[in-house]
Amino acid sequence: MPRPVSATPAPVAHVVLSSGFSRRYTAGVREFAVEAKTLRDVIKEMDRRYPGLGEYLEEETTVAIDGEIHEVAYYQPIRQGCEVFFIPKLEGG
């Protein structure tokens, strides 16, 4: 009898929001453990937990993964234990 194939669990990322985002969307909670394979998955999970947050993260932030800033990071892979930090975009002038 063949053995069932088990799906590989997604890595768990340490997600950090700025205090402004957390006050607006998560009642002040700034840090989260999120199971995800890509940054897109992180954003979708954050939006599932806090409706409306995903769109805001996509449009109004830049993201740093383990200290490296990514302007376009939607499909960046997530590694176990990595830190994902959402940074407010700076407006030029």
Where are these regions (language model features)?
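Ubiquitin-like/PB1-type beta-grasp interaction modules and other compact soluble beta-rich domains
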Residues: 1-92
